[in-house]
């Protein structure tokens, strides 16, 4: 039977509950209590030798400490920071001098520290009670020792102990700590600060002060039968040895604290809970090296308060303090929540939650205590309303803060985090609603009482003082309407001359002190309504009105530009008896108004563009309007009137053409005086402009930036007699200069007529020219040779009908000359058939002419051909701009990048493959030459089709456009033909996609419109001699059985439009839905381009 191994000098088996250490010599294990080694000391031992091995191997050696500035008494390196709590830190802290706490600590006898005293004076500063007499505090006799604490609390009680030198917490039994306390050789500095003994036998020896019992929420409002037990924070025992130090902290939950020193002495380092100090504390506490920074060095003042034996110190909510124990000390303490500083308690609680601090003196169930207090306040409000009394102001303010906290805790996203502390059987939503109602009733009642008090006083000074206090700080509310000022100033003008001194109040050299925070809080709560009440009650008194007008006039004159100096002369008088009393108040308001005007002007200039210096006077004129001076317009913005100015200066009525719409787009963009959002500083608040500048329209404008880039590299344009060379000067060019559009080019005689009648022919031509211009951007003479001569000849005739200028360049024998000739045709074509396009397309034509170096001889040579193409000037084209806000951008998106079927993207690199020289006709385009030429060709080819149809079956005679479905046109456009057609690949004239798509679009228009306009027919017959015969005769010779591809489209789809019989029959029929107007028909026809290229 194996024996159980034994260890240590006591030769006992291994015990898991006892600390043991191994000897490095004999490798045996020893209990720490048997060999005198504490568990906390073991990490510092490098080599341990048991008592038996010490005789042969020597004593144990400790680790070499390299951070004496942190944990040891040795010399500290100058480079490394001092650790808080180390011996070097304590030494420096003792030698440092601090401001005396006499300035902030109130010394009050215990008998005077009552509830009435606290409500009257508040509890915002520490209170030191020299003796416990009259305080109601019960503590043991001074002969009470630490050993007595062990006896009454229990030696096995586990306590949290702070290692001061390392600023770390550990747990020990009370017996072990008491043994350490009475030991003569203290190797460490240990501190017990959170021994709560309210549930032990020692609780009967200690009772908190009476004032704490009366103020504490937990003592008064927490039900005894609640499911959650009361927080045990009222009775703490502090056992601190010499040089114990607790770093700066805020008590958990923002609770107030009381300390009574039974034995020894304690030193408190107190810091006010100002907003800046709390922010600094939060930043310091969240730093990883906060234990190496003394927080008192970061604030303006830290007060030193020494509490000696028998004294009691009360520390209010939110105060940041640290404690030092110069000698061994035994003290008692407690924490409590109260209604005198609810706001500070809530703020400290939020800071604690953000920092996620694990304080040793945690206030458990803080939110539960707040809920119980809220329920009590609701009952108190109801009782006060029934009795006709008013609750104290601090309770009303505390109820508002609590109700706001309740709302935040019960929000949907935060409820899961806070519902654990919600008391049982509570209806939070109902409590919040009822409490808000009672608060509102209480505030209304208090405001109703206030005018009565003012009436009893019946003094001008009192009225003026109330008016000054309750006047809101907003410059808008402080300024009456301009019309009221003018009326009063007219009446007061005679008094102005007599009173030179009181009217012009001198500017004080130093600004007066701002009002205290409690006053501003009251002003925030009901400032607006209080102001109204005070104005109504004080309106009959003339001195008040004079004073207000005098101040308002001076404030306005300082806000106005220097040229408005008339306001300085009309100064209102103030009676002599009121000048002495009110001069300081007026100066205060004057400083406030002056600061606001300067800050507003500073923000305006900071956020404005360079032209803002020219616009500031106009804006200040508008600010003087009655709208800006309206008292009810509390939240009006600085540039709210700028919107009115913009609406007056909006675009004039312009042509509905495409570039007319683009010009409107340019003019719509207001000339900005500031950035997209203007922030106006108003006492530290930022207000956002109600009408921001819309930047959305800038994105499409950048799409046209390639036109500007093109202009930068173009050669100097050639001066021509028929084109205005000064067209580059635009009256309404934008500041950025990304797109310049000529608006001064002289149009033709018929241009204004068509412009006024809403014609869109100009816009369509401009679209074609823009498309041609983009399509020809990257062509050069060496890119690729042209197509065969027969193909060029056929396509040239077709494009001369359509006036598609860019593709002429691919038909010339010499590549570069063809480009110049095509641009010449483009320039003259726009001049001849301007119809409203002269103003908008002039600059693009000049750019095109400048790039291709137009020859004047070629220009005259092609003039006759173009004259024959444009004989339909009496035709009125309906506008297409209603499809999109910016049709030029929509139509550009329909273009193709190359000969592929992919749609054109404006952001992609423009460079179509050769020999294609032009883009297909874009959506919204209608060119008269295409209609007339193709209609005439269709008329001739339809007769040939009629002769062929006699030899065919009866089913083919019934072929009409009414029976032709969209699938027919789709299949034809995809390259399939009917029985009378041939594949498009066999026809040489169909090798250019631009010409085929142009012809197909117009042919589809004729075929799908059963009742075309009569102008179209007359024009097509008149132009048939040139367009049809001159172009197609050679191509159609000997091929009567196989007509050309354009004829295929027109023959299959247009017999009703070309045949007189079908035309007469069609007039009797009702037009199709969506095909009544030319605009509808054209829009329907142009959709065939979306499926890809057309093969004829």
From Swiss-Prot:
The modification Phosphoserine is found at residues 474, 539, 655, 681, 705, 730, 733-734, 738, 879, 882, 899, 1056. Enzymatically inactive by itself, and become active following phosphorylation by PKA. The modification N6-acetyllysine is found at residue 720. Residues 197-353 form the JmjC domain. Belongs to the JHDM1 histone demethylase family. JHDM1D subfamily. Component of the PHF2-ARID5B complex, at least composed of PHF2 and ARID5B. Interacts with HNF4A and NR1H4. Interacts with RELA. This is Lysine-specific demethylase PHF2. The gene is PHF2.
């Amino acid at each position: 039977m194996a024996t159980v191994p034994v260890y240590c000098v006591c030769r006992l088996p291994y015990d898991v509950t006892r600390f043991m250490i191994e000897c490095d010599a004999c490798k045996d294990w020893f209990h720490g209590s048997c060999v005198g080694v504490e568990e906390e000391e073991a990490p510092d031992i490098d080599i341990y030798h048991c008592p038996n091995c010490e005789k042969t191997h020597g004593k144990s050696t400790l680790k070499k400490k390299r951070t004496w500035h942190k944990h040891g008494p040795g010399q500290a390196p100058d480079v490394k920071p001092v650790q808080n709590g180390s011996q070097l830190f304590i030494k420096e802290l003792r030698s440092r001098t601090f401001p005396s706490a006499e300035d902030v600590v109130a010394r009050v006898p215990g008998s005077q520290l009552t509830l009435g005293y606290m409500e009257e004076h508040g509890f915002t500063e520490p209170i030191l009670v020299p003796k416990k007499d009259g305080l109601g505090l019960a503590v043991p006799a001074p002969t009470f020792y630490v050993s007595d604490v062990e006896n009454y609390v229990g030696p096995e009680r586990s306590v949290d102990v702070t290692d001061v030198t390392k600023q770390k917490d550990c747990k020990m039994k009370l017996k072990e700590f008491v043994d350490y306390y009475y030991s003569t050789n203290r190797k460490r500095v240990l501190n017990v600060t959170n021994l709560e003994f309210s549930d032990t036998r020692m609780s009967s020896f200690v009772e908190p002060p009476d004032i704490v019992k009366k103020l504490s929420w937990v003592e008064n409002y927490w039900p005894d039968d609640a499911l959650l037990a009361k927080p045990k924070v009222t009775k703490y025992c502090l056992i601190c040895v010499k040089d114990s130090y607790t770093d700066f902290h805020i008590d958990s939950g923002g609770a107030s604290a009381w300390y009574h020193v039974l034995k020894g002495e304690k030193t408190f380092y107190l810091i006010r809970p100002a907003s800046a100090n709390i922010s600094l504390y939060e930043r310091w506490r969240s730093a990883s090296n906060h234990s190496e920074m003394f927080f008192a060095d970061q604030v303006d003042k830290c007060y030193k308060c020494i509490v000696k034996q028998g004294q009691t110190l009360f520390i209010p909510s939110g105060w940041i303090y640290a404690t030092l124990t110069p000698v061994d000390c035994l003290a008692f303490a407690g924490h409590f929540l109260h209604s005198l500083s609810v706001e500070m308690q809530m703020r400290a609680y939020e800071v604690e939650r953000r920092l996620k601090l694990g304080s040793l003196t945690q206030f458990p169930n803080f939110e539960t205590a707040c809920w119980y207090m809220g329920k009590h306040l609701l009952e108190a409000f109801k009782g006060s309303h029934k009795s006709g009394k008013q609750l104290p102001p601090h309770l009303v303010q505390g109820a508002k803060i609590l109700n706001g906290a309740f709302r935040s805790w019960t929000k949907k996203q935060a409820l899961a985090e806070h519902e654990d502390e919600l008391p049982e059987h509570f209806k939070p939503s109902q409590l919040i609603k009822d409490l808000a109602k009672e608060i509102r009733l209480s505030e209304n009642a208090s405001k109703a009482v206030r005018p009565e008090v003012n009436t009893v006083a019946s003094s001008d000074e009192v009225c003026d003082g109330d008016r000054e206090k309750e006047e809101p700080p907003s410059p808008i509310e402080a300024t009456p309407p301009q019309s009221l000022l003018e009326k009063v100033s007219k009446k007061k003008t005679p008094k102005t001359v007599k009173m030179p001194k009181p009217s012009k109040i001198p500017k004080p050299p130093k600004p007066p002190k701002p009002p205290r925070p409690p006053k501003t809080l009251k002003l925030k709560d009901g400032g607006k309504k209080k102001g109204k009440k005070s104005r109504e009650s004080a309106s009959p008194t003339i001195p008040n009105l004079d004073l207000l007008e005098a101040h308002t006039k001076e404030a306005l004159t300082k806000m106005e530009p220097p040229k408005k100096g008339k306001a300085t002369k009309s100064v209102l008088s103030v009676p002599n008896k009121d000048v002495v009393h009110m001069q300081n108040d007026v100066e205060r308001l004057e400083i406030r108004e002056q600061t606001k005007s300067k800050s507003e002007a500073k923000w305006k200039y900071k956020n404005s563009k360079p032209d803002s210096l020219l616009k500031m006077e106009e804006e200040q004129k508008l600010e003087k309007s009655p709208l800006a001076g309206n008292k009810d317009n509390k939240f009006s913005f600085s540039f709210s009137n700028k919107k009115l100015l913009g609406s007056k200066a909006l675009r004039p009525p312009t042509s509905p053409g495409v570039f007319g719409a683009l010009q409107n787009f340019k003019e719509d963009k207001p000339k900005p005086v500031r950035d997209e959002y203007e922030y106006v500083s108003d006492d530290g608040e930022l207000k956002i402009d109600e009408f921001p500048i819309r930047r959305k329209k800038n994105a499409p404008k950048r799409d046209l930036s390639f036109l500007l880039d093109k202009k930068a590299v173009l050669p100097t344009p050639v001066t021509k007699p028929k084109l205005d060379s000064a067209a580059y000067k635009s009256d309404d060019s934008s500041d950025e200069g990304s797109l310049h559009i000529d608006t001064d080019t002289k149009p033709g005689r018929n241009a204004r007529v068509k412009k006024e009648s809403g014609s869109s022919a100009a816009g369509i031509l401009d679209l074609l020219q823009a498309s041609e211009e983009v399509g020809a951007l990257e062509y050069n003479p060496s890119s690729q040779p042209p197509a065969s001569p027969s193909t060029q000849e056929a396509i040239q005739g077709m494009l001369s009908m359509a006036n598609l200028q860019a593709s002429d360049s691919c038909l010339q024998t010499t590549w570069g000359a063809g480009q110049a000739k095509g641009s010449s045709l483009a320039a003259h074509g726009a001049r001849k058939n301007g119809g409203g396009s002269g103003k908008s397309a002039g600059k693009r034509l000049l750019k095109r002419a400048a790039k291709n170096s137009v020859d004047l001889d070629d220009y005259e040579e092609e003039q006759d051909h173009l004259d024959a193409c444009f004989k339909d000037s009496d035709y009125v084209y309906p506008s297409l701009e209603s499809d999109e806000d910016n049709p030029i951008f929509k139509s550009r998106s329909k273009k193709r990048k190359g000969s592929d079927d992919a749609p054109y993207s404006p952001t992609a690199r423009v460079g179509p493959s050769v020999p294609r020289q032009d883009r297909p006709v874009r959506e919204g385009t209608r060119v008269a030459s295409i209609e007339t030429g193709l209609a005439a060709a269709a008329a001739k080819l339809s007769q040939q089709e009629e002769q062929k149809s006699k030899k065919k079956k009866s089913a083919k005679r019934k072929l009409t456009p009414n029976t032709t479905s969209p699938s027919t046109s789709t299949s034809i456009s995809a390259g399939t033909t009917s029985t009378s057609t041939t594949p498009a690949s066999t026809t040489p004239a169909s090798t250019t996609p631009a010409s085929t798509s142009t012809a197909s679009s117009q042919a589809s228009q004729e075929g799908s419109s059963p009742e075309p306009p009569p102008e179209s027919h007359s024009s097509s017959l008149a132009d048939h001699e040139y367009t049809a015969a001159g172009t197609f005769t050679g191509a159609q010779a000997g091929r009567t059985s196989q007509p050309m591809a354009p004829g295929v489209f027109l023959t299959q789809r247009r017999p009703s439009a070309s045949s007189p019989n079908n035309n007469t029959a069609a007039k009797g029929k009702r037009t199709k839905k969506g095909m009544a107007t030319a605009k509808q028909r054209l829009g329907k026809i142009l959709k065939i381009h979306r499926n890809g290229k057309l093969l004829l």
